[in-house]
Design a protein with these regions (language model features):
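Asp-based phosphoryl-transfer active-site loop
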Residues: 9-24
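Short, charged N-terminal beta->alpha structural module
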Residues: 88-110
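Single conserved hydrophobic/aromatic residue that forms the stacking wall/gate
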Residues: 162-171
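Short, well-ordered secondary-structure micro-motifs within conserved domains or adaptor modules
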Residues: 118-130
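Short acidic low-complexity segments
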Residues: 3-5, 111-120
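Structural recognition of alpha->loop->beta junctions
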Residues: 63-80, 164
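Short, acidic loop-to-helix structural element flanking the phosphoryl-transfer center
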Residues: 23-46, 54-58, 72-89, 101, ...
Length: 171
């Protein structure tokens, strides 16, 4: 028999986002009540995501569009973790970054310089559009000595799948 967990005794919670809080643009069942309970009980909480593409502000707005009020300080992304790692391990370093606003803003905010000629690191994050030119540039920079860092080690990202029938219905 398993042991039951008394959540009231817990001081705080760390939750993944995609697939736990929402899927696509839909809040999952029970999430609104859970967040309300966290606030009512003054519980500490942090939402983690390994998606480096979003800033905490964008995540705040995404959840707001779904009807949830979660302040920006309750989000921590892989972009923020990557930027903190570089700031601590290689102060003053420069990077060639491939990714969205979440990654670029986190790197800038950490005082990391962008460099597309001879960077110390090539940092690859979540992106909606990678070009062959950008990937070739990144590959060449790594071959010339830049260290490669992935802001997310997933081999694939979560996505909504549509069958051909569902696609026909949306047309």
């Amino acid at each position: 028999m398993g042991t039951s967990i008394n959540f009231n005794e817990k001081k705080g919670f760390i939750c993944d986002m995609d697939g736990v809080i929402y899927h696509g643009n839909r809040i999952l069942p029970g999430v609104a009540e859970f967040i309300q309970w966290l606030h009512e009980e003054n519980k500490e909480y942090l939402f983690l995501t390994n998606n480096s593409g979003y800033t905490p502000r964008e995540l705040n707005q995404k959840l707001a569009r779904m009807g949830l009020d979660v302040p920006e300080e309750h989000f921590y992304t892989s972009a923020l973790a990557t930027a903190a790692f570089l700031r601590e391990q290689a102060p003053g370093c420069s990077v060639f970054a491939i990714g969205e606003a979440g990654l670029l803003n986190a790197l800038y905010d950490a005082g990391i310089t962008m460099n597309d000629v001879n960077p110390d690191y090539v940092v690859v994050g979540e992106g909606r559009s990678y070009s062959l030119d950008t990937l070739t540039k990144a590959t060449n920079l790594v071959m010339q000595g830049a260290k490669l860092i992935g802001a997310n080690s997933d081999v694939s990202g979560p996505c909504l799948l549509y069958t051909s029938d569902a696609a026909d219905e949306r047309s």
